[in-house]
């Protein structure tokens, strides 16, 4: 798309792709505070699933997958739901690397990106998860996750094998891991990278096309040259 000085929505849309270095709009930190994002977003179906597990389950939840597959965005939606914040309302700032939400007599603790934590902090975090009272959501790429569990395992080979099995499944997998110091931690692993997210993508596309922000382009002299703008005008009429 061509930059339009009169429509900042165009600039926002241009920040979502990776054709050039300006892809800041795809970052979860930017999505948290952007009114444009809240206007087109699609709340992922897993938000409800993970909320139920954290509130009523007996395990911690691990959300893993590939870089850029939307894990942090999903965590943002879950945070809003747990806090009772309207999903269409932007936050004043992005999520901290650790967010705590009180629930009954426990806390729901969201770790939005495990790679932001030092090795020492990760090990302390895993130890805290063994206490069993609070519920944790860990968002992490697979490499960082494997490294943390291997460091703290009594049997590194068995730990890696079991965790890789859980990560490689398209269905959520519950595991209990034995850690050093005769401690155990129970987790349920969800791999977002193995889910077919085309349903979310199609809904997002519909929202991007239907938003009234495109109406500002009607006064642009070159708008008629762009097929998607003509299609949007036809759709709206």
Question: Where is each model-derived feature located?
Answer:
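N-terminal pre-Walker A segment at the start of P-loop NTPase domains
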Residues: 22-49
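Phosphate-binding P-loop
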Residues: 52-58
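Walker A/P-loop nucleotide-binding motif
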Residues: 60-73
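Post-Walker A helix-loop "phosphate-sensing" segment adjacent to the P-loop in P-loop NTPases
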Residues: 81-89
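Conserved nucleotide-sensing/catalytic segment adjacent to the nucleotide-binding pocket
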Residues: 101-137
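A short beta-strand-to-loop transition that corresponds to the Sensor-1 phosphate-sensing loop
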Residues: 113-114, 140-144, 173, 193-195
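Conserved small helical "lid"/interfacial subdomain of P-loop NTPases
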Residues: 176-186, 190-220
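Conserved small/polar residues in nucleotide/adenosyl-binding loops
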Residues: 227-234
């Amino acid at each position: 798309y061509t930059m339009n000085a009169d429509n900042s929505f165009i600039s926002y849309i241009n920040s979502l792709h990776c054709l050039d270095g300006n892809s800041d709009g795809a970052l979860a930190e930017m999505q948290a505070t952007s009114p444009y994002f809240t206007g087109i977003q699609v709340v992922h179906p897993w938000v409800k699933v993970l909320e139920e597990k954290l509130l009523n389950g007996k395990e911690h939840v691990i959300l893993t997958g590939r870089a850029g597959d939307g894990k942090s965005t999903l965590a943002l939606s879950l945070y809003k739901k747990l806090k009772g914040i309207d999903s269409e309302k932007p936050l004043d700032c992005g999520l901290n690397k650790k967010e705590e939400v009180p629930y009954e007599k426990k806390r729901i603790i969201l770790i939005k990106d495990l790679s932001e934590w030092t090795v020492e902090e990760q090990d302390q975090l895993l130890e805290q998860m063994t206490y069993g009272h609070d519920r944790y959501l860990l968002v992490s790429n697979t490499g960082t996750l494997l490294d943390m569990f291997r460091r703290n395992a009594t049997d590194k080979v068995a730990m890696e094998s079991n965790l890789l099995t859980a990560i490689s499944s398209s269905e959520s997998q519950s595991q209990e891991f034995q850690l050093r110091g005769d401690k155990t931690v129970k987790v349920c692993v969800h791999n977002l990278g193995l889910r077919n997210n085309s349903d979310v993508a199609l809904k997002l596309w519909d929202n991007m096309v239907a938003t009234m922000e495109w109406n500002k382009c009607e006064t642009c002299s070159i708008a008629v040259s762009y097929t998607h703008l003509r299609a949007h005008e036809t759709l709206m009429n």
